[in-house]
């Protein structure tokens, strides 16, 4: 999609003799998945004269992301790309930018409104459904599952849970026995998983909403001497040190599902 966008920008630049086209990117967080997306955006922009890109990360903070979007509006950017940290808190600020006439592209995460120009992202409901079917099959239709979600107010976390529940609801002997918000991060995942292990003597599978949550859950289980009792499934499937593909090869994860960065 960025190729089409920059193609249109390039044609405009040829006709108008280099008015700069400024793009502001308001990222919700700062992690390996986001780094890959940012690199893809910057790499594509390099092919077009007169295009500048500035990227700001909110560090998983709604207030900081609202400040970032206001900053880009004040700077008079020509296009805003936003990955909303949480849907409800970010809806008013995205609507404000859109109503000022700034084209707004939402990437990966949605808001609770249709006041934006375009949305680009994977089908999180379908990813959750696929994970549910995979785990149900791996457990042969019977077992206890715990779920460690991304930030609960973000649309990917909502949709990944909904799709997962739709899948496992077809298996009466598959039970979701616990669920906690791990905020997309390893540290909270380890803490929440430790609590779950204390509450539940039998856990057969861990559904982690991304590949940072999954190793945190695994580490907690390993510290309790229970990591071999259950399978761990994540989402992202990035290559590289400590990422999902390596975790599968190292037998930390049973599987990881691809979630494209769309940069």
Where are the language model's segments positioned?
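Bacterial N-terminal signal peptides
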Residues: 1-10
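A residue-level marker of the well-folded mature domains of exported/periplasmic proteins
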Residues: 13-263
């Amino acid at each position: 999609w960025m190729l089409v966008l920059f193609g249109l920008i390039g044609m405009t630049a040829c006709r108008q003799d280099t008015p700069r086209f400024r793009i502001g990117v308001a990222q919700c967080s700062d992690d390996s998945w986001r780094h890959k997306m940012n690199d893809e955006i910057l790499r594509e922009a390099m092919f077009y004269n007169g295009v500048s890109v500035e990227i700001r990360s909110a560090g998983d903070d709604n207030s900081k992301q609202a400040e970032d979007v206001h900053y880009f509006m004040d700077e008079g950017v020509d296009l805003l790309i936003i990955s909303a940290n949480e849907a409800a808190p970010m809806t008013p600020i995205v609507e404000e930018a859109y109503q000022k006439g700034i084209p707004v592209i939402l990437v990966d995460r949605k808001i609770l409104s249709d006041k934006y120009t375009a949305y680009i992202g994977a089908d999180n409901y379908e990813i959750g459904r696929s994970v549910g079917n995979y785990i149900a099959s791996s457990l042969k239709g019977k077992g206890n599952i715990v779920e460690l979600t991304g930030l609960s107010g973000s649309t990917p976390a909502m949709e990944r849970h909904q799709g997962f529940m739709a899948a496992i609801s077809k298996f009466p002997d598959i039970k979701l026995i616990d669920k906690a918000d791990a905020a997309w991060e390893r540290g909270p995942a380890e803490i929440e998983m430790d609590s779950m292990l204390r509450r539940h003597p039998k856990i057969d599978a861990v559904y982690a909403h991304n590949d940072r949550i999954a190793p945190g859950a695994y580490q907690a289980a390993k510290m309790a001497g229970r990591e071999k009792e259950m399978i761990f499934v994540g989402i992202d499937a990035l290559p590289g040190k400590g990422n999902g593909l390596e975790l599968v090869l190292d037998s930390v994860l049973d599987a990881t599902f691809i979630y494209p960065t769309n940069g």
